[in-house]
């Protein structure tokens, strides 16, 4: 019984460690890279689809940051008008 409980505890610890390695998505905890598109991801994260374009994770994050910044600037300009 003790070994079963230790095994379950080890599985929980490993699952949480894998989730912390890729904090963008809590759904795909058993995969190191999420392969879903943002629209199909249950949590709506942009952790995905960069493998299809050949981008690295850093390039994808930088592209997303630029997109969010330009979207925010356009929104602020529309509020000023």
Curated annotation (Swiss-Prot):
Tissue expression remark: Expressed by the venom gland.
UniProt GO cellular component terms: extracellular region
Stretches that traverse the bilayer: none
UniProt keyword terms in alphabetical order: Disulfide bond, Secreted, Signal, Toxin
Cleaved signal peptide residues: 1-17
PTM comment text: Contains 3 disulfide bonds.
Cystine pairings recorded for this chain: none
One example GO MF annotation: toxin activity
Localisation: Secreted
Recorded family membership: Belongs to the scutigerotoxin-02 family.
Protein name: U-scutigerotoxin(02)-Tl2a
Organism: Thereuopoda longicornis
């Amino acid at each position: 019984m003790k070994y079963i409980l230790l095994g379950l505890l080890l599985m929980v610890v490993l699952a949480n460690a894998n989730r912390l390695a890729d904090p963008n998505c809590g759904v795909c905890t058993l995969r190191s890279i999420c392969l879903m598109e943002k629209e199909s991801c249950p949590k709506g994260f942009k952790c995905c689809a960069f493998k299809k374009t050949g981008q690295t994770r850093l390039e994808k994050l930088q592209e997303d940051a630029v997109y969010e910044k330009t979207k925010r600037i356009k929104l602020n300009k529309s509020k000023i008008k």
